[in-house]
Structure formats: C-alpha cells, structure tokens
Swiss-Prot record:
Organism field: Mus musculus
Protein location: Secreted
Residue ranges, compositional bias (Pro residues): 84-104
Keyword vocabulary terms for this entry: Collagen, Glycoprotein, Secreted, Signal
Protein name: Complement C1q-like protein 2
Signal peptide start and end residues: 1-21
Functional description taken from the UniProt entry: May regulate the number of excitatory synapses that are formed on hippocampus neurons. Has no effect on inhibitory synapses.
Superkingdom, taxonomy of origin: Eukaryota
Gly residues composition-biased segments: 127-141
UniProt-listed GO biological process terms: neurotransmitter receptor localization to postsynaptic specialization membrane; postsynaptic density assembly; regulation of synapse maturation
Broad class of where this protein is predominantly found: secreted
Entry GO terms, CC: cerebellar climbing fiber to Purkinje cell synapse; collagen trimer; extracellular region; glutamatergic synapse; hippocampal mossy fiber to CA3 synapse; protein-containing complex; synaptic cleft
Length: 287
C-alpha cells in the first residue's frame, strides 16, 4: 500500500493544471483525497470550485494495487532464548518425611571402671554374719574417703526387718510383733519384740500403732533403746474409735544394744494378718 501511494502522488501532481490547486501536507491520504482548488477563471468572485476527482493515472495505479496485492509477510527465524529470570520467593516448608531406616549398631564401648571392693564376711558357729576388720591404712585423699564410704554403704552387711502385730496389747508392756515379714540378719526376735544390734553403725527405725478405742481413752507408744525413750507418739479417741500413733528415728547402735516399742498406756489393736500395727528398721551403714 505504501508503494502505491508513492507512485500515485507524483501522478496526481502532474495531472493537476498549473496553479489550479495546492496541497496541504497533512498526510498522504489528505494530499490525494482533499485538495484545495481555487475558483476557475470567469466564475463568481470568491466562488470555490468543486474538488476534482482522482486522475485516470491514479485510478489505474490503485486498480493495479487491488488486483495485485503486496506479497504476504514472511515469518523470520526463531530468536535466541532470553536471559534467565530472577529467582522467585522461597516456598513454604514441606511436610515431614517418613522416618529413615534404622542405622547399624555402633561400635563396642570401652570397658567400665572396676567396681568397689566388697567386705570379707565370716560365718560364726551360730550362723551370724560378722565383718573381718583389716589393719589401719594410711591417710587417703578425699576421693579415697568417698570410695570407702560408698563401699561400706553398698557392700556392707545387709540388716533389715519388717514385722506386724497380730495380737492386741494394752497397759504398759513391750509390743511383741509376732507377724514377721522380713528379718535379714535375724537380728529381730519375735518372742521378745526386741531388735538386738550385732553390727555397730547407723540405723533407721519407724513404727505405726493402731489404737483400739471406743471408751474415750488415749494410747501412747514409745520407741526405746536400752530402756530409754527415743521417740514417742500418741493416739486419741476423739469419737472415732480408731487412731494411729507413728514416729521414726535414726540411731547409732553399738553391738548388744536393744530397740523396741512399748505401750505407755492405752490399747493397741492387733490386725490378725492385716498388719495395722507395724515395726521396721534397717542398717544405713556400718561403722
């Protein structure tokens, strides 16, 4: 189309009479289609002649262009790929994956340190257990003292008892706990109700006595060492018939000392095999 216009414009200029018209340079279409013409000679003054139509040569050019349209555009080759874009924002974290397979076993560890030495024990003719004392060693450091204390605590003689009261008692008498559950070392005698020390050291004792009431009286229970009261407990009959008296002690005992529980008035309830009233103790560590 542009080629046709370039050919048609000069032809139109040649076909127009000299001085008959001038063209306003406002674009090729207006130059061809909208010329300004002056009034022809002999016409009324100031009259404007009608615009002349296209020339024969211009019409031939336009017909030739419509009969033979310009060739179609040819698509060029594909261009090179563009540059990579900028990275996008980070996406949200994904869901946790399934657990992986179990790994192989690790290597064998180093051997542990040697354990604490135990105490050498001997058995007497009566079946009791005694401790063989060694000679006095030299002064050790703090670590050696701790080791000796642990050795004595965990490797010393095992002494413990736990007994219950089957028969009821009242008045002022030693409670004979005749239901023996535990008696390591055989240091408790159920016929006397007394614990007899054979290994010097620190011991723990506790007792719980159920009062048999209903008559408005109270009950006292004392833990004694060699006849001396070391702990006391009281239970009162406050319109409920039954009440407990309990206490605990930590004592240092020498060989031959005796520990027991004695009533100091009132009534103690015997529980058959239910063990409502109990007495127990054990060796914390020997001297």
């Amino acid at each position: 189309m542009a080629l046709g216009l370039l050919i048609a414009v000069p032809l139109l200029l040649q076909a127009a009479p000299p001085g008959a018209a001038h063209y306003e340079m406002l674009g090729t279409c207006r130059m061809i289609c909208d010329p300004y013409s002056v009034a022809p000679a002999g016409g009324p003054a100031g009259a404007k002649a009608p615009p002349p139509g296209p020339s024969t040569a211009a019409l031939e050019v336009m017909q030739d262009l419509s009969a033979n349209p310009p060739p179609p555009f040819i698509q060029g080759p594909k261009g090179d790929p563009g540059r990579p874009g900028k990275p996008g924002p980070r996406g949200p974290p994904g869901e946790p994956g399934p657990p992986g397979p179990r790994g192989p076993p690790g290597e064998k560890g180093d051997s542990g340190r040697p354990g604490l030495p135990g105490l050498q024990l001997t058995t007497s003719a009566a079946g009791g257990v005694g401790v063989v004392s060694g000679g006095t060693g030299g002064g050790g450091d703090t670590e050696g003292e701790v080791t000796s204390a642990l050795s004595a605590a965990f490797s010393g003689p095992k002494i413990a008892f736990y007994v219950g009261l089957k028969s009821p008692h009242e008045g002022y008498e030693v409670l004979k706990f005749d239901d023996v559950v535990t008696n390591l070392g055989n240091h408790y005698d159920p016929t006397t109700g007394k614990f007899s020390c054979q290994v010097r050291g620190i011991y723990f004792f506790t007792y719980h006595i159920l009062m048999r009431g209903g008559d408005g009286t109270s009950m006292w229970a004392d833990l004694c060492k060699n006849g001396q009261v070391r702990a006391s407990a009281i239970a009162q009959d406050a319109d409920q018939n039954y009440d407990y008296a309990s206490n605990s002690v930590v004592l240092h005992l020498d060989s031959g000392d005796e520990v027991y529980v004695k009533l100091d008035g009132g009534k103690a309830h015997g529980g058959n095999n239910n063990k409502y009233s109990t007495f127990s103790g054990f060796l914390l560590y020997p001297d």
